[in-house]
Amino acid sequence: MKIIILGAGQVGGTLAENLVGENNDITIVDNNADRLRELQDKYDLRVVNGHASHPDVLHEAGAQDADMLVAVTNTDETNMAACQVAFTLFNTPNRVARIRSPEYLAEKEALFKSGAIPVDHLIAPEELVTSYIERLIQYPGALQVVSFAEQKVSLVAVKAYYGGPLVGNALSALREHMPHIDTRVAAIFRQGRPIRPQGTTIIEADDEVFFVAASNHIRSVMSELQRLEKPYRRIMIVGGGNIGASLAKRLEQNYSVKLIERNYQRAEKLSEELENTIVFCGDAADQELLSEENIDQVDVFIALTNEDETNIMSAMLAKRMGAKKVMVLIQRGAYVDLVQGGVIDVAISPQQATISALLTHVRRADIVNVSSLRRGAAEAIEAVAHGDESTSKVVGRAIGDIKLPPGTTIGAIVRGEEVLIAHDRTVIEQDDHVVMFLVNKKYVSDVEALFQPSPFFL
């Protein structure tokens, strides 16, 4: 595909990195010549220096014959204008835009539709991150929770702990422990390295285990890998920006929520907007404030300011003072690997959430959902099996007979309303939704090719 990426920031650059190795023709546009030079030195792509929404710049980038335009500059207005220009002047067929402002998002149904601003797919990072954190709170102890096929099946990452019934046992014992629940371990990472899960594989404490199950069975499977934690009740949020405010609004009906905001005017506004959240104006690094608000009784402390260092330090302080779990929002990708797994329980990257959403729209038509995992090194993919036995490499074939790319595991199949956990004898049928885990994202193009029907396939 010929894809134009507008914006060479962290998201634009990471998206280009993901797509360049998949036989795509990538052009990236930005007004920062140094950043463009840096990307061109690293990857096989074209660059255009200029303003992303200007017609002459888009023409130079090849909007007239591009398959897709992805607008991820730092300003919503530029992204919207670029989509409008690409549609009106160049008839670029697929247009994706990142929009952050809650004022635009509040009117998205009216603004982004046929006959209005021509954005085919809207990416709202703050909404994605809010939903992601909400899922983690719903499943105490989970490191990642990703849902597929309209929430019917989920891929969950947990850390195996001493005391979990399966820890120290082989994977084959999973069915003995849960005879009425079907699940599949898609991957195990031990000390950061992937292990191919087999029936004889012994689960060790501190293993990062990715399993696939019907969404209503997640808690049961988690209880086999770690001591099942009690549902969270008390939550403290630091930072009353878009994400913090949105998260508090979603949680306040079912949890006891406190929010700390440093800016007095913002705190005052939030106290009026939020019905059941207690809002404080103060510094989350203030030990006296945390002590007064009973930090030792908090189930989850979530730091969501715009400053990585503030989030990390306040979370470390909260953990030391007794908070049971701490989560932090991290903008810099390099920090995520450094902090998660120690004092910090979960590090959340808005860039990875955005990349996952973008890849879902950029992948070929048979790929309907993508989640970037393990800080972008791995991926979970939902693909639809199209074609028949004469045109497809997967339809009508048992999973054990399909030659999958290295490190690829089929975890589940969703057939209509039915969730089928994948086993070697499971046969894929036309229109099945197939959920896969890829230990290494470099094999994504091989998976795409596997699911593309071909009239020449015999």
Curated annotation (Swiss-Prot):
Its main location: membrane. Residues 1-123, 232-348 form the RCK N-terminal domain. The lineage of its organism: Bacteria, Pseudomonadati, Pseudomonadota, Gammaproteobacteria, Vibrionales. NAD(+) 1 binds at G7, A8, G9, Q10, V11, D30, T73, N74, R98. It is found in: Cell inner membrane. Transmembrane segments: none annotated. The keyword Cell inner membrane applies. Residues 143-227, 368-453 form the RCK C-terminal domain. It comes from Vibrio alginolyticus. This is Trk system potassium uptake protein TrkA. It is a peripheral membrane protein. The RCK N-terminal domain binds NAD and possibly other effectors. This is expected to cause a conformation change that regulates potassium transport. Disulfide bonds: none annotated.
